[in-house]
Amino acid sequence: MNRPNRINEEIRVKEVRLIDQNGEQAGIVSIQQALEMMAEQAELDLVEISPNAEPPVCRIMNYGKFLYEKSKTAKEQKKKQKVVQVKEIKFRPGTDEGDYQVKLRSLIRFLEDGDKAKITVRFRGREMAHQDIGLDVLERVKNDLAEISVVESAPGKLEGRQAVMVLAPKKK
């Protein structure tokens, strides 16, 4: 069986630093003494906690309960982690005020949820002649969201027929 920790008779060293079930140091003892102490406190296992220490550190505990607690804390930590996503909102150079406000509210929601926001301004046809209008839209978005975000990548040159800017939420 492949376990992260060796237990009981799997421990193949002469001496171990023993910690009893109360978490108190019992000192350095032979492996036989440790197994006998474990037998006295029936239903408990001798678990190798730190195999690389000199001598290895072993603890008397209920191994099943130990594994359960370990997996429970790992699940809790995994729950707390948040995967940052990049949400995209597309504008046009001629986006009207009402649409602009709706899209701005969406951007605020994305940033408050901890996601990054990618703002794209797409140019069609003759709009390419007025790229400055599109860049003004990006500048306006940047200024409106300055309190809750930082610019991660500023709009430089156009990528094909679109200008792109990425905003990240400010650290609290």
Curated annotation (Swiss-Prot):
GO terms for molecular function: ribosome binding; translation initiation factor activity. GO terms for cellular component: cytosol. It comes from the Bacteria. Its main location: cytoplasm. The keyword Cytoplasm applies. The record marks 100, 103 as: Important for 30S binding. GO terms for biological process: ribosome disassembly. Pfam families: IF3_C (PF00707), IF3_N (PF05198). Keywords: Cytoplasm, Initiation factor, Protein biosynthesis. It is found in: Cytoplasm. Belongs to the IF-3 family. NCBIfam families: infC. IF-3 binds to the 30S ribosomal subunit and shifts the equilibrium between 70S ribosomes and their 50S and 30S subunits in favor of the free subunits, thus enhancing the availability of 30S subunits on which protein synthesis initiation begins. Monomer. This is Translation initiation factor IF-3. It comes from Haemophilus influenzae (strain ATCC 51907 / DSM 11121 / KW20 / Rd).
